[in-house]
């Protein structure tokens, strides 16, 4: 695929991935407007992996992992970063070739570079999800993850969904040949050059300070409990509302991650909180499946 975008900028790099996967037939959807720790939390992955309905999509997802913050001092460790998620259901037999095609679209020459698929099965304890998978290593550095979902929210995936997750900053650093994420060129156009650091460095400094020092522990514990209560109430309605209930799951998960960053949860408590999130996610998954089933799985028609 020839692209009109400059892959040597972070902006052009993302546009190229979107264009490539659009040409493969994916719906290019927009990022979820909530704090999540990974692109898998997006309903287009978590919920759409359930049931028999086919659905292929691709999207950028901003991810927040409060414990990974380093006050803007680490060149490749961030508490806020981007993933590019591709979800293919049912998973095509040539998914590996499609992925390699995306690297070629980004200007990675397979004749020069060493691309390896290293077995690494994936699990998300909070989402009750797991799958068979591989890490993708480019010249010895992990840049992507492949997963064939076997189970989501405790439910078997049939057909199997194929998921590809790109670590955007890491892959872009490789393509731009820089050692610090803050040195990535975001865009270079008529209005001048803008760097990743111009866009996000101050955010990393301030959010790290908030995550580790100022997030209100008492408020976060209450928020977690409130989200759990709201989730259960929404699923207990005469006509359950699994989509709003799922938003409560994500809010509870983020509250837990902030509590983790504040070291407010002991090791034993930590497992208990993970189990509470997983119980919510499982209930949502079952309710969503039943709702689609009641509609006759319309996308199968």
UniProtKB/Swiss-Prot annotation:
It catalyses: tRNA(Gly) + glycine + ATP = glycyl-tRNA(Gly) + AMP + diphosphate. SUPFAM superfamilies: Class II aaRS and biotin synthetases. It comes from the Bacteria. Pfam families: tRNA-synt_2e. One of its GO terms (cellular component) is cytosol. The keyword Ligase applies. One of its GO terms (molecular function) is ATP binding. InterPro entries: aa-tRNA-synth_II/BPL/LPL (IPR045864), Gly-tRNA-synth_heterodimer (IPR006194), Gly-tRNA_ligase_asu (IPR002310). Disulfide bonds: none annotated. One of its GO terms (biological process) is glycyl-tRNA aminoacylation. Its EC number is 6.1.1.14. It is an enzyme of class 6 (ligase). Keywords: Aminoacyl-tRNA synthetase, ATP-binding, Cytoplasm, Ligase, Nucleotide-binding, Protein biosynthesis. It is found in: Cytoplasm. NCBIfam families: glyQ, PRK09348.1. Belongs to the class-II aminoacyl-tRNA synthetase family. Tetramer of two alpha and two beta subunits. This is Glycine--tRNA ligase alpha subunit. The lineage of its organism: Bacteria, Pseudomonadati, Pseudomonadota, Gammaproteobacteria, Alteromonadales.
